[in-house]
Design a protein with these regions (language model features):
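Terminal leader/tail segments of proteins
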Residues: 2-70, 77-147
Length: 147
């Protein structure tokens, strides 16, 4: 009889562990960032289409690292930015309307603010954006209006 009771307790403990793990997974998933929590630094217009984006350091290559968001979705976490543009982030075919790019400084490097340069392109036209992001302030954003 004692063996049956210990098996029940083990099953209950295992069930509690599994439910805790599932709860932890769902409650700690990255939620979308809210545009209202970012400081708007400007806006641009671009024709809709297959949108891509490149991000690199427009100032001194001094160890900046950032988080990059598009429409609230984290697309690059702890991205170290350098003077050469990396491969393009393919954002897909986007419809006309308002979209936004968000930048949060993780490390400002050795000189001033984190200084990402963003090029957003529809395959034919592109627009270059310089954004400043500081560690101890509200993250920065740029509105992109697709026509």
């Amino acid at each position: 009889m004692p063996q049956k009771n210990s098996n029940k307790y083990l099953l209950i403990i295992l069930l509690i562990i599994i439910l805790s793990a599932v709860g932890y997974y769902f409650f700690t998933k990255n939620k979308k960032a809210d545009f209202k929590n970012f400081t708007l630094q400007g806006q641009t217009e671009l024709n809709a289409g297959k949108i891509g984006m490149k991000v690199w350091d427009y100032s001194a290559e001094d160890g900046d690292s950032i988080q990059v968001y598009f429409d609230g979705k984290l697309i690059a976490d702890s991205l170290a930015i350098f003077n050469d543009p990396p491969s393009e982030y393919k954002l897909g075919r986007l419809s006309a309307g308002e979209h936004w790019i968000g930048v949060k400084a993780i490390n400002e490097g050795t000189m001033g603010a984190a200084s990402p340069h963003v090029r957003i392109s529809n395959g034919r036209d592109s627009f270059d954006i310089d954004i400043e992001a500081w560690i101890d302030s509200i993250p920065s954003s740029w509105k992109v209006i697709l026509k």
